[in-house]
Structures are given as structure tokens and as C-alpha cells.
């Protein structure tokens, strides 16, 4: 005979009391208890990408994977997130497994290179152990691993060139992510894993592209970003940057599959002003007539490049446009200011 509702409630209360006693108060809670807080985020540096992510940036306390072809802008996006975290008073770490970090370029993107924690590990085990220890310190706001493909297991480094090491890297990533995810949530650290693309042999239907490091990173990531270069930006005959498209292929904190486009300028990174012009035109704050851009009767310039330079020089107008866009779309500092470490986000 099934137990009565009263008996079930009493049994549940006893079990919850015992769990709280053994593991601490709040180990189990009802999702509807208390006020739900917004998810704390780190802005990406592109307002269009912040909008595509649905919450105004990369979620704190989660795993994020950024992947794409070579020279598509993966590290640039990650470094902009680092710069924004530091600008808000946060501490950032960069695990440079590729041994290819350019401090001068990072500085141009706004990264405080003097305060940035950098490690250039010898093996994949060393890289992930360092990352885990930094996360468990509870002091870190953002951690970047560049890249997963360069996390070479110790056995492969110490072995001969022709030796087979099937599945070693995948097992290493799986074990590391099992350990890290809980610590990330507790510390509120955002872990960004930059990944490369490979092609599967013999695929007849569907995309042959796949990422390195096995399937664990796909499962543990709350956000996965596919970064592609779609166009070369030119000033006359000189190439000055790339038009970049980012697709949010996985998103556990907002609806997925949204896309964002923005400009990455050589030596400057993501053009914040270019993103504001694109979003301003899309949402009616900036008027485009022919090749002219106007804002509330004021001419910003003829052509996007001139309008971008105008906003670069007139930061008050730029900030005003940014504020209006964020208010309309419900993203930004005002919305995420109330976010706390114990926020309970809804997962999609």
C-alpha cells in the first residue's frame, strides 16, 4: 500500500534535515525557494555577441568552449573577455599550452599583462593540474586554456615519435573536467577552453569537422562558440581586419543557435564601435541613409569606417548609444549587478 501524503512529507523532511546536518545547510533546496537572481556574466567585448548569448556575456562559474579554423579570432574573443574581467576588478589566468601568447597584442586589447597570471606548461597533465589548483583557490574570475589540442599527455611527450597513444588526451580531458566543474561553480570562475578543428576521415554525409580532445568538453560546456572568418575588411587595397561570424552552437543558460557578426581589426581586436553601429542600425537608434550614418540628427559620417572613427573620438555619444541598446535588449551591468555567487539559473 502506498504511503499517505503526510507520511511522505514527514519522511522527506527528516531526510532533508539529515542531509543538512551531514553536508551543510543548503546542500539540497527547492528550486522555487527565495528570489532567483540573474546569471553573473563577463562581457565578450562585442555587444552583438553578448546579445546572441542571451544573458549579456559569458556565464560565470561555467565551462565555455571557443573553437574554429586557424586565425578566425578565437584567442582574440578570449582575451577581450579577460580584459573585461580585469576591468571589473577580477583576476585572470592564461594557460598558454601553445606557447604562442603575444603580450603586446594582449595589451592592445586592454589586458593588464602585468597582473595576468600566465603558465606555459610542459605537459597536458601539468596544465590541467595548474588550472584546477587556481580554480580551487576561489580567487580567480576567468581562466583561459589555449588550446585543448596542445594539451599533450606526458606519455606522448616522453614516448617515441611513432608511438600510438589512442584516446589518451580524451581520457585526460574527461578526468580533468569531472574534477573542475564543481569547483568552477563554487568559485564563480569562467573557464574558457580554446579548441581547434580536425576533419573526420570517410564522412559521406554531414559535416566532417570535429574538435580535438574527445567528447567530454562538448558535454561539460555550458556555452560553445563556433568562430569563423567570413570576409576580409579593406581600406582601399590594404587589408585592415576581418569580418567574423560567431554561432552559439550550445547554450545551457539561454536559447541556443543565435549568430553574431562583428569586425576584428588587425592590432586592435574587436571593434566595439563597429558592433554598436551594426546594432544601432538594426534596432533603430542609428539611421542609415545611403552611405551616411546619423544619430538623433547628428551625422556620424559617410561610410561605416568614418562613423566608427567618429564614435571612437566622441565617447559620450558612443556610451549613450550603448546604454540605449542594452536597456532595450535587457542586458548589461545594470541587469547583472544583482547577480550573486549562489544564483540558481534555469538551464535550457
From Swiss-Prot:
Superkingdom of origin organism: Bacteria
Subcellular localization: Cytoplasm
Single annotated GO MF: ATP hydrolysis activity
Residue numbers binding ATP: 68-75
GO cellular component: cytosol
Pfam families: RecA, RecA_C
Record InterPro entries: AAA+_ATPase, DNA_recomb/repair_RecA, DNA_recomb/repair_RecA_CS, P-loop_NTPase, RecA-like_C, RecA-like_N, RecA_ATP-bd, RecA_C_sf
Main location: cytoplasm
Keyword list, A-Z: ATP-binding, Cytoplasm, DNA damage, DNA recombination, DNA repair, DNA-binding, Nucleotide-binding, SOS response
SMART domains given in the database record: AAA
Example of a GO biological process term: DNA repair
Keyword Glycoprotein on entry: no
NCBIfam families noted in UniProt: tigrfam_recA
Function: Can catalyze the hydrolysis of ATP in the presence of single-stranded DNA, the ATP-dependent uptake of single-stranded DNA by duplex DNA, and the ATP-dependent hybridization of homologous single-stranded DNAs. It interacts with LexA causing its activation and leading to its autocatalytic cleavage.
Family the UniProt entry places it in: Belongs to the RecA family.
Name this polypeptide is given: Protein RecA
Biological source species: Rhodococcus opacus (strain B4)
Underlying gene: recA
Amino acid at each position: 500500500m502506498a504511503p499517505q501524503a503526510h507520511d511522505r512529507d514527514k519522511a522527506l523532511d527528516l531526510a532533508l534535515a539529515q542531509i543538512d546536518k551531514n553536508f551543510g545547510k543548503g546542500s539540497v533546496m527547492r528550486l522555487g525557494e527565495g528570489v532567483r537572481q540573474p546569471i553573473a556574466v563577463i562581457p565578450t567585448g562585442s555587444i552583438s555577441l553578448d546579445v546572441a548569448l542571451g544573458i549579456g556575456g559569458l556565464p560565470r562559474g561555467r565551462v565555455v568552449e571557443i573553437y574554429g579554423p586557424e586565425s578566425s579570432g578565437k584567442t582574440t574573443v578570449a582575451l577581450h573577455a579577460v580584459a573585461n574581467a580585469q576591468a571589473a576588478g577580477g583576476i585572470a589566468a592564461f594557460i598558454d599550452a601553445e606557447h604562442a601568447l603575444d603580450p603586446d597584442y594582449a595589451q592592445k586589447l586592454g589586458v593588464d599583462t602585468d597582473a595576468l597570471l600566465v603558465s606555459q606548461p610542459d605537459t597536458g597533465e601539468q596544465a590541467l593540474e595548474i588550472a584546477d589548483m587556481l580554480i580551487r583557490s576561489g580567487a580567480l574570475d576567468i581562466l583561459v586554456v589555449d588550446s585543448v589540442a596542445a594539451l599533450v599527455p606526458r606519455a606522448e611527450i616522453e614516448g617515441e615519435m611513432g608511438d600510438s597513444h589512442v584516446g589518451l588526451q580524451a581520457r585526460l580531458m574527461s578526468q580533468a573536467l569531472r574534477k573542475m566543474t564543481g569547483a568552477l561553480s563554487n568559485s564563480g570562475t569562467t573557464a574558457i577552453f580554446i579548441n581547434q578543428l580536425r576533419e573526420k576521415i570517410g564522412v559521406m554525409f554531414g559535416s566532417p569537422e570535429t574538435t580535438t580532445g574527445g567528447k567530454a568538453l562538448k558535454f561539460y560546456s555550458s556555452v560553445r562558440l563556433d568562430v569563423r572568418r567570413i570576409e576580409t575588411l579593406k581600406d582601399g587595397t590594404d587589408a585592415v581586419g576581418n569580418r567574423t561570424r560567431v554561432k552559439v552552437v550550445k547554450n545551457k543558460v539561454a536559447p541556443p543557435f543565435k549568430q553574431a557578426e562583428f569586425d576584428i581589426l588587425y592590432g586592435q581586436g574587436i571593434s566595439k564601435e563597429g558592433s554598436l553601429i551594426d546594432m544601432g542600425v538594426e534596432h533603430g537608434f542609428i539611421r542609415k541613409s545611403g552611405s551616411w550614418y546619423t544619430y538623433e540628427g547628428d551625422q556620424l559620417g559617410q561610410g561605416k569606417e568614418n562613423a566608427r572613427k567618429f564614435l571612437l573620438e566622441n565617447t559620450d555619444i558612443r556610451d549613450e548609444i550603448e546604454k540605449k541598446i542594452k536597456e532595450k535588449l535587457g542586458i548589461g551591468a545594470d541587469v547583472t549587478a544583482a547577480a550573486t555567487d549562489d544564483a540558481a539559473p534555469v538551464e535550457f
